[in-house]
Amino acid sequence: MNINFTLISQAMAFAIFIWFTVRFVWPPLMRAIENRQKTIAEGLAAGERGKRELELASQRSGDVVREAKQRASDIIAQAEKRAAEIVDEAKVAAREEGDRILVGAKAEVEQEVFRAKEVLRQQVAGLALAGAAKILRREVDEKAHAELLASLKAEL
């Protein structure tokens, strides 16, 4: 009888222990396990989101770098084009300035030639007058014969 009573009392104590455990101990343990599972799941999800965001950020940074390189090459191309335009404009301006200086120099040379011819005409007229005076053996009055001298200058 002792074994039976002991066995039954042990079974009842075990049943009370199970009831107590299921009633008071098991729910907090399950809540703790579920909270831990939820925390772990959220951590894994956050890790995945972080991974995706890192990939997107990496892709965006690559796009930004490519765009910056493209803009830089465009700016360099525009600068080179503008430099070529400035050089061409300078060449045109220099050519125009050279032409203007050449025209001025030609005009100045023509004026000098005209002045030299005028001086030569006067000298030739003077020589002709001197020659005529020697031929006639008399002095020709320059004032009296100014009209004759002017016509001689015009012919020369």
UniProtKB/Swiss-Prot annotation:
Q: Does the UniProt entry include the keyword Transmembrane?
A: yes
- In the UniProt record, does the keyword Transmembrane occur? yes
Q: What is its main location?
A: membrane
Q: Lineage in the entry?
A: Bacteria, Pseudomonadati, Pseudomonadota, Betaproteobacteria, Nitrosomonadales
Q: Which GO terms describe its cellular component?
A: plasma membrane; proton-transporting ATP synthase complex
What is its membrane topology? Single-pass membrane protein
Task: Identify the keywords attached in UniProt to this record, alphabetized.
Answer: ATP synthesis, Cell inner membrane, Cell membrane, CF(0), Hydrogen ion transport, Ion transport, Membrane, Transmembrane, Transmembrane helix, Transport
Family the UniProt entry places it in: Belongs to the ATPase B chain family.
What Pfam families would the database entry show?
A: ATP-synt_B
Which organism does this sequence originate in? Nitrosospira multiformis (strain ATCC 25196 / NCIMB 11849 / C 71)
| Alphabetical list of PANTHER family matching this protein | ATP SYNTHASE SUBUNIT B (PTHR33445:SF1), ATP SYNTHASE SUBUNIT B', CHLOROPLASTIC (PTHR33445)
One GO MF annotation is: proton-transporting ATPase activity, rotational mechanism
The record's InterPro entries line, in alphabetical order, gives: ATP_synth_B-like_membr_sf, ATP_synth_b/b'su_bac/chlpt, ATP_synth_F0_bsu_bac, ATP_synthase_B_chain
This protein's name: ATP synthase subunit b 1
Q: What is the recorded function of this protein according to its Swiss-Prot or TrEMBL entry? A: F(1)F(0) ATP synthase produces ATP from ADP in the presence of a proton or sodium gradient. F-type ATPases consist of two structural domains, F(1) containing the extramembraneous catalytic core and F(0) containing the membrane proton channel, linked together by a central stalk and a peripheral stalk. During catalysis, ATP synthesis in the catalytic domain of F(1) is coupled via a rotary mechanism of the central stalk subunits to proton translocation.
